[in-house]
């Protein structure tokens, strides 16, 4: 009997609703807010946002802001930093060819009465700061307030390599879009991808020609542009038109008050936007001027300039800030050691004060050597000295050998007698010696007859072997001695991979796509060669009981390239120690300094003095060991816009942190719970892949952009530095497959087409088998002489099942090209 339950009728009791009292509930406050909540920094409570601040609260908030600014100023003085921070680097980038970046720059400069062509003031204006001593006319510095300055740059093209160089050092990016072409094209999408892959700086969207749109459609057009922009940059809400002077003033106010995002990988290293450079021919020293940004700089460090290489620092000088608003604002407490710096590129002004911040001896500087020169005799046994050879001759034992035996043949005979037995043998009677000599002669005659018979048998065997070779030649079968040279060429090693890559270049893209599709459908499956024994063809491969847990010695059979690279005993400990060295470095951020580079790049000076540069030049201070070569691993993902195939060991172009170079990575799948990673032939889309190269050591974090060539026309993949570890094992897997020829019983079957020689079956007999339907088994014995074998499995077999065998070998990336700038010896 079911349990009776009461069901209320129409006249059921109605209780009173809950009354929260004078305060509102969280849900009521949230509904009233309607999502119009703007938070700065940490997340705030909804109840706190719902309270309207009165005058006392607003006054208290203002006092806290003033106090925080005073504390910040005191902290800067305590650390020895200048009163004014370095100018904010603002870059103008267009998103379509119809956009006019020159007009945007002209409007911003005309607001301060600056001429865009000359960069000079049309009227006297203290608020405008223009560096007239710069070699590069692309730099224009403007003082927005007494504390905030702006350095305005213009990216004149949409070339990806130019956009990357500007984005790497920009604090604020002004993206310019044309209202007549509101939809983003593929190039604009890739520019957004490039910016996001390098960590997003502060971004403002500028809309041009919005005044040409009908008034009724302006709001709708602006909302559509804003929705697209917020999709790529959800934390950047600033989308502003800029067609009038009032709108230009609004943009400047946002630039002045907007919070600048900190980019971690850029902040941890000292870097400088080179504003001026000169060459001293007497000492072959190149000087570069600019603001130190990011971290502290020491003269012990190595300076890296993209496209030019690494250089040592002779000294670092503190000079007057040429962008200062008023000379009275700047006071140099360290006014000693001021002198004139006569350079080949021009003389310094007499009123500028120079103070040497840091200068170290040559022995204390980091070396420029990037790789080790391996010694091929390192693993060889040391040759014995003359004294050791004399001891060997003195202790050399005498052997009893048949008469007529040569010194080479005497080494075949074992010497099991002791020294005492030899002495006793030498002290025996002459008669005994004669008897033994007679016996020795008889033995010699018998041995000569036996050796003669053996020689005849060998000759007969050679004749038979020649006959077999002759018959096999007509059958298409090669003898083992004949295929030795071919195996050296066809073996699955690095040389073979390179040959395959050269052949793949001749293949058209359709064939490469077909190979990639086959790799997706049938991963790692290979055909067993019929004319070469598998035990020789796959001699470098091995079987593993478990890919995850089976041991593999990381120091086993390493290539000669591993003798050239550097390895850390503890990478994290070395990284922390290298970063801690810069804590007490004398050159602080926001200081305007002059760096003297030993044997600096003269081409840099010539380029800056002959023409207006299309991209800015930057100098980066490297940590200790960051110019050494090691094995680097990157986490990458193929970009959806790149449809062509990318093979392992195919040359691509890396934009890696501040560096850029050509390299040939190998790809693998990362397994977090395994000490071995599986090699991938292709960089497949929609899959997180690891790329491994020989490259300069870099402490993470560091972003990565991969292009198909040095011209950077097409973006291949994006990623970041994962680790620096030469002990990471990357295994190439091949799968040998066979089909079931006959079922002997439920668990015993005959397998064919996996091998073609019974010797190969015995060679790989201990390797575990499995099927595509989940059965596991092993080889029992070969059947016949044509490669069939009897196998046993753990369950009933299906006749349509496929038998597989996994074999593995360790692979390594290609070494850096000899003409690369990454290889350098002192």
UniProtKB/Swiss-Prot annotation:
The keyword Nucleus applies. Residues 332-342 have a biased composition (Low complexity). GO terms for cellular component: nucleolus. Residues 1-37, 329-348, 397-532 are annotated as: Disordered. GO terms for biological process: endonucleolytic cleavage of tricistronic rRNA transcript (SSU-rRNA, 5.8S rRNA, LSU-rRNA); maturation of SSU-rRNA from tricistronic rRNA transcript (SSU-rRNA, 5.8S rRNA, LSU-rRNA). One of its GO terms (molecular function) is GTP binding. Residues 86-261 form the Bms1-type G domain. Residues 416-434, 441-467, 491-510 have a biased composition (Acidic residues). It holds the Pfam family AARP2CN. Its main location: nucleus. InterPro entries: AARP2CN, Bms1/Tsr1, BMS1_TSR1_C, G_Bms1/Tsr1_dom. Keywords: Nucleus, Ribosome biogenesis. SMART domains: AARP2CN, DUF663. It is found in: Nucleus, Nucleolus. It comes from the Eukaryota. Required during maturation of the 40S ribosomal subunit in the nucleolus. Belongs to the TRAFAC class translation factor GTPase superfamily. Bms1-like GTPase family. TSR1 subfamily. This is Pre-rRNA-processing protein TSR1 homolog. The lineage of its organism: Eukaryota, Amoebozoa, Evosea, Eumycetozoa, Dictyostelia. The gene is tsr1.
């Amino acid at each position: 009997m079911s349990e009776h339950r009461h069901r209320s009728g129409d006249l059921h009791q109605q209780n009173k609703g809950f009354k929260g009292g004078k305060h509102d509930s969280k849900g009521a406050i949230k509904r009233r807010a309607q999502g119009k909540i703007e938070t700065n920094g940490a997340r705030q409570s909804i109840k706190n946002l719902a309270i309207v601040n009165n005058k006392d609260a607003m006054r208290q908030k203002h006092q806290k802001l003033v106090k925080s600014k005073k504390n910040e100023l005191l902290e800067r003085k305590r650390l020895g930093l200048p009163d004014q921070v370095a100018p904010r680097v603002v870059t103008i980038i267009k998103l379509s060819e119809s956009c006019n970046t020159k007009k945007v720059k002209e409007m911003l400069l005309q607001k301060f009465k600056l001429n865009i062509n000359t960069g000079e003031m049309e009227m006297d204006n203290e608020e405008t700061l223009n560096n007239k001593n710069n070699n590069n006319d692309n730099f224009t510095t403007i003082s927005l307030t007494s504390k905030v300055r702006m350095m305005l740059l213009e990216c004149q093209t949409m070339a990806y390599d130019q956009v990357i160089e500007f984005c790497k050092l920009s604090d604020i990016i002004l993206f310019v879009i044309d209202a007549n072409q509101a939809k983003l094209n593929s190039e604009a999408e890739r520019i957004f991808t490039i910016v996001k892959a390098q960590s997003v700086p502060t971004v403002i969207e500028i809309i041009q020609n919005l005044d040409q749109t009908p008034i009724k459609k302006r709001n709708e057009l602006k909302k559509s542009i804003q929705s697209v922009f917020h999709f790529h940059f959800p934390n950047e809400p600033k989308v502003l038109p800029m067609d009038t002077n009032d709108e230009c003033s609004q943009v400047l106010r946002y630039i002045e008050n907007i919070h600048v995002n900190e980019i971690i990988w850029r902040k941890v290293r000292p870097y400088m936007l080179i504003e001026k450079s000169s060459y001293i021919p007497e000492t072959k020293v190149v000087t570069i001027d600019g603001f130190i940004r990011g971290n502290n700089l020491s003269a012990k460090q190595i300076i890296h300039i993209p496209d030019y290489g690494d250089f040592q620092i002779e000294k670092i000088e503190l000079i007057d800030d040429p962008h200062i608003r008023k000379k009275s604002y700047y006071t140099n407490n360290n006014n000693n050691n001021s002198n004139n710096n006569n350079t080949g590129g021009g003389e310094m002004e007499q009123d500028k004060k120079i103070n040497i911040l840091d200068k170290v001896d040559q022995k204390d500087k980091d070396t420029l050597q990037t790789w080790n020169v391996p010694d091929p005799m390192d693993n060889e046994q040391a040759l014995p000295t003359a004294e050791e050879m004399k001891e060997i001759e003195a202790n050399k034992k005498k052997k009893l050998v048949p008469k007529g035996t040569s010194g080479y043949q005497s080494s075949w005979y074992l010497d099991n007698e002791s020294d005492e037995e030899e002495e006793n043998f030498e002290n025996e009677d002459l008669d005994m010696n004669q008897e033994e000599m007679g016996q020795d002669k008889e033995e010699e005659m018998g041995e000569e007859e036996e050796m003669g018979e053996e020689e005849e048998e060998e000759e007969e065997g050679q004749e038979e072997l020649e006959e077999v070779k002759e018959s096999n030649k007509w059958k298409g079968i090669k003898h083992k001695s004949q295929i030795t040279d071919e195996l050296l060429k066809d073996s699955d090693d690095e040389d073979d991979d390179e040959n395959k890559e050269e052949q793949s270049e001749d293949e058209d893209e359709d064939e490469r796509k077909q190979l990639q599709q086959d790799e997706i459908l049938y991963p790692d499956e290979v055909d067993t060669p019929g004319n070469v024994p598998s035990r020789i063809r796959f001699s470098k491969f091995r079987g593993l009981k478990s890919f995850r847990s089976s041991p593999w010695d990381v120091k086993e059979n390493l290539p000669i390239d591993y003798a050239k690279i550097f390895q850390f005993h503890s990478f994290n400990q070395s990284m922390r120690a290298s970063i801690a060295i810069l804590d007490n470095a004398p050159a602080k951020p926001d200081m305007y300094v002059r760096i003297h580079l030993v044997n600096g790049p003269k081409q840099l000076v010539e380029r800056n003095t002959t023409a207006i540069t299309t991209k800015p030049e930057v100098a980066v201070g490297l940590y200790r060991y960051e110019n050494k070569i090691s094995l680097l691993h990157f986490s990458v993902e193929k970009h959806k816009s790149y449809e062509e195939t990318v093979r392992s060991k195919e040359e691509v172009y890396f934009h890696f942190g501040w560096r850029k170079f050509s390299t040939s990575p190998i790809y693998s799948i990362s397994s977090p719970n395994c000490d071995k990673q599986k090699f991938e032939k292709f960089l497949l889309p929609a899959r997180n892949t690891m790329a491994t190269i020989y490259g300069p050591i870099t402490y993470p974090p560091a972003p990565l952009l991969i292009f198909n060539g040095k011209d950077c026309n097409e973006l291949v993949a994006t990623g970041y530095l994962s680790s620096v570890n030469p002990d990471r094992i990357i295994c190439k897997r091949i799968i040998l497959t066979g089909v079931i020829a006959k079922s002997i019983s439920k668990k015993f079957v005959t397998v064919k087409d996996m091998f073609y020689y019974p010797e190969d079956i015995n060679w790989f007999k201990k390797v575990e088998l499995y099927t595509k339907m989940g059965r596991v088994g092993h080889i029992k014995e070969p059947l016949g002489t044509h490669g069939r074998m009897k196998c046993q499995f753990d369950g009933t077999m299906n006749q349509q099942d496929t038998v597989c065998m996994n074999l593995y070998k360790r692979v390594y990336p290609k070494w850096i090209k000899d003409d690369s700038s990454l290889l350098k010896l002192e």
